[in-house]
Amino acid sequence: MTSQMVLTLSVGALRPLMKRAKKPLDIFELPTFVNEEMGLRGLNIPSDLLAGRTPKDFERLCDISDKAHCPFLVLIETPELNLWNPVNHPAVIDRLRRLASAATRIGCSSVAISLAEVTTQARADAVVKTLKIALAEMDKFEIALLLQSGTGILSDGKSLVDVVKKVGGFRIGTMPSFQHASTNGGVSQELRKLAPYAQSITASVKGFSEEGDHAEWSLDECVETLRAVGYVNSLSLDYLGKGDPIKPLSMARDMLSAAIEAAEPA
């Protein structure tokens, strides 16, 4: 049986449901809700949603997600991290160590971060040095570190991949998004560069026209591009629009599922 992409959810997309006044969705309900109500098979969770939680809470989340067959996969650090300024090194390394510990407790295999804007090659080189130190600490937890596309010179996929290559090792990778790829060279061009180094990709969902077409970028083109480079890891749906996210996420799920199935050989 051929491996194929798996559809998961970026939990941040459900913030409106978690913050609503009437019957807010509790964090401990997420795995069952996402599996049974949305038909998705894993969770990428922003770090701010875990703020104030205890180690016992983390273990409970891991247990619930295992029983719901909807595991936590990636812990996403919410704020950008400045890795090029040496003044920040102690705090950044400590933060990444804490994230790796939390990720292990809830069952994640990866931590994803966004880099504060890098404007020069010297700063990009400084980022590489900091990442090597950070990975040495994170390796104790057997957690991978994924770099999300950002701003500055690392907004280009090739430049971000160069950082990954310079850091080296199998615990460093990328986590691109459809949205960023669309606005930085186009989904086909950027995803071709980044997907071979990705352990998870954010399937950004903007909205749909009355005819049912996705706005701004083609979900079919995204899947076709990923298939062309042999990507078989997770696609984590994330809604960027306003209002109730369930309908657009469900439409995107169905569209992506159809595209994935169509891409599979008979």
Explain the meaning of each model-derived region.
Residues M1-R105, G169, S250-A266:
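N-terminal pre-domain/capping segments
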Residues V6-L7, R15, E36, G42-L43, ...:
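Acidic/histidine-rich catalytic cores of soluble enzymes
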Residues K23, I45-D57, E80-P90, E117-D125, ...:
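Acidic-and-aromatic substrate-binding clefts and catalytic sites of carbohydrate-active enzymes
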Residues G39-L40, C70, C108, A198, ...:
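A structural motif
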Residues S65, A215-Y239:
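P-loop/Walker A phosphate-binding loop and immediately adjacent motor/lid segment at beta-alpha junctions
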Residues N88-S110, D125-A126, T130-M138:
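An active-site-proximal structural segment forming one wall of the substrate-binding cleft
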Residues A103-A122, F141, L145-G150:
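Active-site groove signature of glycoside hydrolases
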